[in-house]
Amino acid sequence: MDRYAVFGNPINHSKSPFIHTLFARQTQQLLTYEKIEAPVDDFVGSIRRFFAEGGKGANVTVPFKEQAFQLVDQLSPRAKLAGAVNTLKLTDDGLLLGDNTDGAGLVQDLKYHLEELAGKKILLLGAGGACRGVIGPLLEQRPSEIVIANRTVAKAEQLAQEFAAMGKVRVSQFAELNESFDLIINGTSASLAGAMPDIPDAVIGSATVTYDMMYGSKETVFNLWAKEHGAIKTIDGLGMLVCQAAESFAVWRGIRPGTRQVIRELRRNITGA
């Protein structure tokens, strides 16, 4: 039976085995999928052992996505753009292919909820790896502009320069934001700590939708704040998690599983409802 895994540290919380088991059942694919906690100082060794022992493919999560980018023999165009790899595949000729499905997963989930991203004015909060991985796929949807806001502007400016050729991208400090947006995406990890990015209320207009890349058993702090300030819709990152997993599954197996039923089952699993 073909063997797959997700590598991270910590990894105990990962829902990837749950998701991929449902995908395999749905598509009638025979495979196993496990979680492996790689030592922080030996990610490369863990990956090499896994593939030497017959592994076919893997997902990579925090904090190893940049290391995976350096490790592979080949990079997909979207992995090159993202500067990080979250999906590894052993090709038929024994090469390790690196891909990045995060941005595609976000866009798929956004389009399910919003249908259209073209012409939208988007605010992206944060300039770390999570944000970098989604800017290219977002710009491919032709929004009117993306504003990258970060506590330190230098990191945001570097990102904006890298993606400037793909569309209109500008930067702002959190405190300087004084306009409203159609869509606000929280790519900071503040929600994990139950905290809020330090942004003014003015970013929420009469038709603002917010999307937090984080998720949990309850609504995230960021989405609760957005709702209190008049956001017309709030979405968490559970759909992105499942959609990027479906994209990885398609890279490995050549078949794309449906996501909506899996999202519902995962939501039940997380909330206990």
Curated annotation (Swiss-Prot):
GO MF, any single term: shikimate 3-dehydrogenase (NADP+) activity
EC number(s) recorded for this UniProt protein: 1.1.1.25
Pathway annotation from the record: Metabolic intermediate biosynthesis; chorismate biosynthesis; chorismate from D-erythrose 4-phosphate and phosphoenolpyruvate: step 4/7
GO CC annotations, alphabetized: cytosol
Assembly behavior: Homodimer.
Annotated NADP(+) binding sites: 126-130, 150-155, 213, 237
GO biological process: amino acid biosynthetic process; aromatic amino acid family biosynthetic process; chorismate biosynthetic process; shikimate metabolic process
Name of protein: Shikimate dehydrogenase (NADP(+))
Name of the coding gene: aroE
Binding residue positions for shikimate: 14-16, 61, 86, 102, 215
Keywords: Amino-acid biosynthesis, Aromatic amino acid biosynthesis, NADP, Oxidoreductase
Coiled-coil features, chain-numbered ranges: none
